[in-house]
Amino acid sequence: MPKRKKQNQPQPPQHLALSERDEPGDEEDERPMGPPSLLGPPPMANGKPGDPKSVFHRGPPGSRGPMIPPLLSLPPPPRGRGHIRGGLGPRSSPYGRGWWGVNTEPPFPGPGHGGPSREIFYQEPRNPRRLKSWSLVKNTYPPKDSPPMMEDKSDRPVCRHFSKKGHCRYEDHCAFYHPGVNGPPL
């Protein structure tokens, strides 16, 4: 395979230039070397730097596939904590004033952070009226021991499927009238 041979060729002596220097960032004609940028290399598409088509496809060297642009990857807004007093801005410390306002606790409390567990955090509130109505509906059905009683649906329109084919795939759960099954025959 010719592609494997190209990959195994020795790299150009790019690393030697770094080792010849005393420290990175000594030379004044180059940009001072600091911590690596989170944005990766400058955008390139088809070998052209700065091409607008390549903005969404940049990533760290060696990575493949699209990367989310940094402006679209902000942390999610906190839920259930009221409005943010500190506003959007850089965080001074992980739990201090900044993204989460005056709160001194992490934004998503969990078992590792000493707060309540996430299960409670994401649990939706219960509706007592809904629970009460379900208990009433549950008690209106006859017990399983007694023979089932069919609901009279003769006041409803006749089921088209039952009238054409003689059966309906919804059977007892159909909302329409099945003559002779859930009411008097026609």
Swiss-Prot record:
InterPro entries: PRR3 (IPR042805), Znf_CCCH (IPR000571), Znf_CCCH_sf (IPR036855). SUPFAM superfamilies: CCCH zinc finger. Keywords: Metal-binding, Zinc, Zinc-finger. GO terms for molecular function: zinc ion binding. Pfam families: zf-CCCH. This is Proline-rich protein 3. PANTHER family: PROLINE-RICH PROTEIN 3 (PTHR47398), PROLINE-RICH PROTEIN 3-RELATED (PTHR47398:SF1). Gene3D superfamilies: Zinc finger, CCCH-type. It comes from Rattus norvegicus. The lineage of its organism: Eukaryota, Metazoa, Chordata, Craniata, Vertebrata. Residues 33-44, 67-79 have a biased composition (Pro residues). It comes from the Eukaryota. PROSITE patterns: ZF_C3H1 (PS50103). Residues 1-97 are annotated as: Disordered. A zinc finger (C3H1-type) spans 153-181.
